[in-house]
Regions:
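A short helix-loop-beta-strand connector motif used in the catalytic cores of GNAT acetyltransferases and
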Residues: 51-69, 117
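Conserved GNAT acetyl-CoA-binding A-motif
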Residues: 144-156
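Conserved active-site alpha-helix within GNAT-family acetyltransferase domains
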Residues: 134, 146, 158-176, 187
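Conserved acetyl-CoA binding element of GNAT-fold acetyltransferases
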Residues: 112-125, 177-180
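Conserved acetyl-CoA-binding loop-helix of GNAT-fold acetyltransferases
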Residues: 120-123, 129-142, 169
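Conserved N-terminal entry element of GNAT/NAT acetyltransferase domains
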Residues: 1-21, 188-191
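Conserved GNAT-fold acetyl-CoA-binding loop/helix
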Residues: 28-55
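Conserved beta-strand in the GNAT
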Residues: 69, 94-104, 117, 122
Length: 191
C-alpha cells in the first residue's frame, strides 16, 4: 500500500551543531514567507543572516535554551534505497524538516519572573498539517515543565492566518496586539 503524506513518520530531537546549516535555511525560509505576506515585516539584517549558524550555536550552548528539530523517519532516519532488490540503507544523519527555539527568560519586573519564549518556529511546506508543529511544541512544553516554568509566550504575525490557527489549536491565546507605524505616518494624521 502506498504511503500517504499524512502517514509520514517523523521524530523530534534536540538540535546539534550538525543541524546549523539547516537551521539557517529554515530561518531564512520563515523570513521569506513573512515578507511575502507583508513587505512591512521587519527583516533580519544581512549581518545576522550571515551569522545565523553562530547565533543558533550560542543559543544551543545555554542550558536554559533548546532548539528542537523534526527529522523524517520514525527514529529520525529515513531509509534510502540502495538499488532494485536490495535492502535500504539508513543514512548516518537525516536533515531536519522543522525547527522550534524555546528559551527560559528571567525578568524581575514581570510576574511570573521566569517564563518561556518560543521563537523561530518553522515546518517545511511538505510536512505541514502532519502534526509536526504539535510534536515540536510538546517537546518545548516538556522542557519548560521539567524546569517548573509556568507560562510560555510567542508572537505570530497577523498576516499569517495559518500560523495563528495553528498556535491557537495548540492552546495559545492572543492576549496583546503590537502596533507598528512610522513617525511620519503618525505626524501626518489629522485629528
Amino acid at each position: 500500500m502506498a504511503e500517504t503524506k499524512r502517514s509520514r513518520k517523523y521524530s523530534i530531537r534536540r538540535a546539534t551543531e550538525r543541524d546549523l546549516p539547516e537551521l539557517k535555511r529554515m530561518r531564512i525560509a520563515l523570513q521569506d514567507l513573512l515578507i511575502g505576506r507583508d513587505p512591512r515585516v521587519w527583516r533580519l539584517s544581512p549581518e545576522l543572516i550571515d551569522g545565523l549558524e553562530e547565533f543558533y550555536s550560542k543559543i544551543m550552548e545555554k542550558d536554559q535554551n533548546r532548539i528542537f528539530v523534526a527529522i523524517p523517519g520514525k527514529n529520525g532516519d529515513s531509509p534510502l534505497p540502495r538499488g532494485r532488490g536490495s535492502n535500504p540503507v539508513q543514512p548516518p544523519f537525516s536533515q531536519p524538516v522543522a525547527m522550534l527555539v524555546v528559551r527560559i527568560l528571567d525578568n524581575s519586573n514581570l510576574d511570573p519572573v521566569r517564563f518561556g519564549r518560543i521563537d523561530d518556529a518553522w515546518v517545511d511546506p511538505e510536512w505541514r498539517e502532519r502534526g509536526v508543529m504539535t510534536g515540536l511544541t510538546r517537546a518545548a512544553a516538556s522542557f519548560l515543565a521539567e524546569r517548573r516554568v509556568s507560562m510560555v509566550m510567542l508572537d505570530w504575525a497577523n498576516n499569517n492566518p495559518p500560523s495563528g490557527t495553528c498556535w491557537q489549536k495548540l492552546g495559545f491565546e492572543p492576549l496583546m496586539t503590537m502596533g507598528f507605524a512610522s513617525p511620519t505616518d503618525i505626524l501626518s494624521r489629522k485629528e
